[in-house]
């Protein structure tokens, strides 16, 4: 086998490896995208719940008098 054929074979092997790697990375991106979409939905639900909570009747810290030991 001459050097040119060996170089072509090496390039074909590298290309096959890169194609496999790209496919694996693509699958990971899809999984992460699905996970991010689910987390965004959970965050929207949490924000909605927090916005519907009645405000606390406790005074702000700036309005509180200092504790007796001061």
Curated annotation (Swiss-Prot):
InterPro entries the record matches: SlyX
Question: Would you indicate the residue range of the signal peptide?
Answer: none
The UniProt entry, under Pfam families, shows: SlyX
Gene3D superfamilies in the record: 1.20.5.300
As for family, the record states: Belongs to the SlyX family.
The name on file for this protein is Protein SlyX homolog
UniProt source species: Shewanella sediminis (strain HAW-EB3)
């Amino acid at each position: 086998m001459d050097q040119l054929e060996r170089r072509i074979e090496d390039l074909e092997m590298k290309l096959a490896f890169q194609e496999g790697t790209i496919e694996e990375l693509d699958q990971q991106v899809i999984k992460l995208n699905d996970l991010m979409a689910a987390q965004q939905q959970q965050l929207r639900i949490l924000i909605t719940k927090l916005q519907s909570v009645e405000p606390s009747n406790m005074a702000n810290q700036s309005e509180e008098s200092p504790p007796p030991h001061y």
